[in-house]
Amino acid sequence: MTLEELITEGRNPNTMDIDRLSTVDMLKKINEEDKKVPLAVEKVIPSIAEAIDRIVPRMKKGGRLIYVGAGTSGRIGILDASECPPTFGVDPGLVVGIIAGGDSAIRNAIESAEDDVEGGRQDLVNINLTERDSVIGISASGRTPYVIGALRYAKEVGALTIGLFCNENKNVENIVDVMITPIVGPEVIMGSTRMKAGTAQKLVLNMISTGVMIKLGKVYSNLMVDLQASNEKLRERARRMVKLATGAKEDLIERVLNETNYNVKLAILMIVGDMEKEKAQKLLEMADGYIAEAIKLKDLVLQGEE
């Protein structure tokens, strides 16, 4: 596939005059194009759902979720991965972002790194990729050599391979298990895929990581009950979440949170289930961390004791 054949490299007929518009009209043009992104993502929801449903069983067996990309695509992967530990309380090694050119490429563009096919492979070798892992190759064009090299190696290892591209690429179907292709069309500025393509990638990765974490029991209702309350803002959020989940009084919430070292999930179960810390911990372990399941188990245990 040549550069001219890529949709993301096309010239946008709607923005040909953007250099002659007023600031407000220029921004309206950009905004009009941006509105197309969530609609493009909506069309690929079935593929996103398939990816989530195939990632979760692997993670339950000890697998990791790994994002691989170059340039903007790599940075977006790192951004999403880096937010998982504080948001969902997971180990920093569970969701990993890898960028062509290494960490220095996060701040400074290393454009030549994307052409390194072997680099994509080697970076996955360096993190000891296994068949339990899931690898998402992120590329606006769908043909970035670094990303293709990584996906090819992941396929060889037996890992789940997912392609997140903004162009169709039938040439990689043999190395990609799940293809996610939000087609956002030509960019406002020709070839500037940090714009619509990057936004689409961000939306999709948000959906994948959030969906996976929900299915791993990291969310109760719509509360991030495994957050790490590492500063005052997050401690305040923790108190509010326990309040919303339990309706308990402030003094009880404060006491239980202090007793659990601000473990929101444990605090909610202790209050809702009216139980001691040790029993709540045991039920959570039995329920694989799912609060709703732990509450059901408590009721079953009580029925068995009657």
Curated annotation (Swiss-Prot):
EC number: 4.2.1.126
A Pfam family: GKRP_SIS_N
Keyword Lyase: yes
Bilayer-spanning residue ranges: none
Domain SIS: 55-218
Pathway(s): Amino-sugar metabolism; N-acetylmuramate degradation
GO BP term (any one): amino sugar catabolic process
Reactions catalysed: N-acetyl-D-muramate 6-phosphate + H2O = N-acetyl-D-glucosamine 6-phosphate + (R)-lactate
Keyword Transmembrane helix found: no
Keywords, alphabetical: Carbohydrate metabolism, Lyase
Residue numbers annotated as active site: E83 (proton donor), E114
Molecular function GO labels: carbohydrate derivative binding; carbon-oxygen lyase activity; ether hydrolase activity
Protein task: Specifically catalyzes the cleavage of the D-lactyl ether substituent of MurNAc 6-phosphate, producing GlcNAc 6-phosphate and D-lactate.
Protein family membership: Belongs to the GCKR-like family. MurNAc-6-P etherase subfamily.
Additional detail: A lyase-type mechanism (elimination/hydration) is suggested for the cleavage of the lactyl ether bond of MurNAc 6-phosphate, with the formation of an alpha,beta-unsaturated aldehyde intermediate with (E)-stereochemistry, followed by the syn addition of water to give product.
PANTHER family: GLUCOKINASE REGULATORY PROTEIN
Subunit field text: Homodimer.
Name of the protein in question: N-acetylmuramic acid 6-phosphate etherase
Organism this protein belongs to: Caldanaerobacter subterraneus subsp. tengcongensis (strain DSM 15242 / JCM 11007 / NBRC 100824 / MB4) (Thermoanaerobacter tengcongensis)
Originating gene: murQ
